[in-house]
Amino acid sequence: MLYDLLGGMAGDIQALNVFRYITFRTGGATVTALLISFLFGPRIIALLKAKQRRGQPIREDGPQTHIIQKQGTPTMGGFLILVGLVPSVLLWADWSNRYVWIVLFVTLGFGAVGFADDYLKVSKISPKGVPGRVKLFFEFVIALIAMWALVLVSSEPLQTALTVPFFKTLLIELGGFFFLFGALVIVGSSNAVNLTDGLDGLAIVPVMIAAASLGLIVYLVGNAVFADYLQIHFVPGTGELAVFCGALIGAGLGFLWYNAPPAMVFMGDTGSLALGGALGAIAVAAKHELVLAIIGGLFVLEAVSVIVQVASFKLTGKRVFRMAPLHHHFEQKGWAEPTVVVRFWIISVVLAMAGLATLKLR
């Protein structure tokens, strides 16, 4: 909005030229989202607490300490993140950029699926919400619509091609399979973040780290000069997604203020599915789907731990981990919750640095 209102006046008022800069608007979106989520946080949390009464149902088969320590904490805190994120993006982003609208569509669509899941859990006072197959169906519908839109706005030769890290010019043409591949990235990213969201502050910081990394990537791939210098594929228009990433970080920081141990509110599926879907959509738009697996490696580890645990138990009757997802395994080994959280944050930073290194190591 401000880009259109004030950027167009830059010819008459030189100072307004800053609204044309993606970096300035990214910073503005970050601060705006932080202030909104921070200031409205207490009211939203109080409302959630009043409506939910007993708070988020705690898994009886999970760590027993959670039943005692986390009982009564409200969920759906992702709504607080979205309240900070969406207005900030609309205020600071270029409304004519179609990538921004596509990622917003994915974010709100997955957020709606998560909200339905959280609502059923709270209303039924049960950890079981929307059936898994139903949830996946709607997630894939949203993701496939987004993929159709992303292919429409992309240009040849990148429309349905997969770029490979460490290789300058290598493109793997996927054709029609690219729609399914991209949808898998978006849905997989969404559910991987969802599985990671099991301890106070555990998911939101790695999400912000991934958003910061992707924000830098979209800024570089969306700039012809930087893309040519780094010898990465130039994707026109994706630079505007840096504003979205900035807003996500700001909203995440505001949420973390209330989600830090001991949490006053849980993110819930409303937040985890929305944020994970957003990260996946941004990676697909920037043609860095495989790099997302490195940057978001912590989410991959959490998801794989669940897959391995379930497969092993069904095939052999034995469990590989003491409990899945992975963070619960370390809790069962005797690690304190803050220890697990901070160490997983460190892993996220290291993996993000490794992912960003692929921009130069070619």
Curated annotation (Swiss-Prot):
GO biological process, alphabetically ordered: cell division; cell wall organization; peptidoglycan biosynthetic process; regulation of cell shape
Entry annotated with the keyword Phosphoprotein: no
EC numbers on record: 2.7.8.13
Membrane topology summary: Multi-pass membrane protein
Segments passing through the bilayer: 28-48, 73-93, 100-120, 134-154, 169-189, 201-221, 241-261, 264-284, 290-310, 339-359
Function: Catalyzes the initial step of the lipid cycle reactions in the biosynthesis of the cell wall peptidoglycan: transfers peptidoglycan precursor phospho-MurNAc-pentapeptide from UDP-MurNAc-pentapeptide onto the lipid carrier undecaprenyl phosphate, yielding undecaprenyl-pyrophosphoryl-MurNAc-pentapeptide, known as lipid I.
Protein name, as recorded: Phospho-N-acetylmuramoyl-pentapeptide-transferase
Source species: Parvibaculum lavamentivorans (strain DS-1 / DSM 13023 / NCIMB 13966)
Annotated gene: mraY
